[in-house]
Amino acid sequence: MMKTALITGATSGIGHATACEFAKHGINLVICGRRLDRLEIIQEKLQKLTNVHILNFDVRDKAATFKAIDSLPEAFKTIDILINNAGNAHGLDPINEGSLDDWDAMMDINVKGLLYVSKAIIPQMTERKSGHIINIGSSAGKEVYPKGNVYCGSKHAVLAITEGMRMDLNPYGIKVGAVNPGLVETEFSKVRFKGDEIADTVYKGYKALQAEDVAEVIYFVISRPNHVNIADVLMFCTAQASSTILNKSL
């Protein structure tokens, strides 16, 4: 029987690329996001390859998250694979100059949103004693960099939650892992720098990871045999050696 995957943050970047990659392999999709117009365009494109259902909600809204997932039609109710991808970064400021609104946005989406969606899906996985959860973290969850403070904190939390999930869900045979990319050329920087011109320079002078690169790794992780769980992946583009070392001559 073909599996069904629920992907948050599916309207752009890694989430969108993962939906496309999964569709190529015939995995049924529940694509989630805040931008209904984009969800509908993606659904129209991908339903030529597989079955696609859209859920339009904001992971920061606890009630809306549970209501949306509870509304899934019978054909999509059984979620075999959960990709917790929704996340963002706002600002790059020293802690003493940071915006409270930026901090709230990062913690609400990157941490609490991941928890809300997971809480809504995990009970069915424990009941079936099967399932696979992939949390999309970041190299920022492995290494703190200057002015990264709260964003790095949120991504360290994602990795801690992932490890805790893996321990707690091990008795049920549920796989849990994290994929942690470094610099990926997506809308990420435009959101972080609020459309500032700085965002346009982030990916200049080198070849950053593309969303499709990360999506291929995610598919590799979820397509391993039942006895194999890839618990943690850190991936960089060749030009990047760490959060602070980038060779723009490559």
Each predicted region: which residue ranges?
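Conserved glycine-rich cofactor-binding loop
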Residues: T11-S12
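Conserved glycine-rich Rossmann-like NAD(P)H-binding loop of the short-chain dehydrogenase/reductase
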Residues: H25-I42
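The beta1-alpha1 cofactor-binding region of Rossmann-like NAD(H)/NADP(H)-dependent oxidoreductases
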Residues: N56-K67, L100
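Substrate-binding pocket helix/loop in short-chain dehydrogenase/reductase
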Residues: D93-I95, D102-A105
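Active-site helix of classical SDR
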Residues: S118, S154
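Residue(s) in the substrate-gating loop at a strand-loop-helix junction
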Residues: S138
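C-terminal helical subdomain
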Residues: A178-V179, E197-T244
